[in-house]
């Protein structure tokens, strides 16, 4: 077994663990039946604002377009027959991470369990790129509601949907239901929710 050279060791040390806004658009709600048809991974700085690292986005051709839910397609406006093959997208994600020296991603998003479960099933060989630590604006809103209920007797947010939280926090642009826009919305929403938590 050979030891790594100094240069190789430096490259290993330089591999990044990053925050990234993450969102998928899918052809339905069931990962066992439906497909990912769009993905966005947008690197963020520690303050949850967009970083200088390039984002990864892709349209993905559905493996089973015949299973697509018409209502889901109507919401996103995406055609499940368009995009790259999912195997190519998997290769492209790996290359994007390698080119940018990214080792692990802490996902930032809204209702991340949905997106991460879909990703794990559709990209099983890549699921370990995501850290077990994540930053979910929906979960943060639920925590804030719990604190508010304890302190004031009522919830601060009547609904923790992305649409309703955006409206309540002054983000007036409508939810786009496209992965890039929704990923960035979730990161912005997370920052705004943080202002509701005061740590003395």
Features from the language model and the residues they span:
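Conserved non-catalytic scaffold segment of RNase H-like nuclease domains
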Residues: 2-120, 167-172, 177
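Short, glycine/acidic-enriched loop or turn micro-motifs at the edges of active sites
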Residues: 24-28, 139, 185
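Secondary-structure boundary motif
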Residues: 95-102, 125, 195, 199
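Acidic, Mg2+-coordinating catalytic module of metal-dependent nucleases/exonucleases
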Residues: 106-112, 117-122, 153-200
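A short alpha->loop->secondary-structure connector
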Residues: 124-134
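Short alpha-helix plus adjacent loop in nuclease-associated cores
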Residues: 135-154
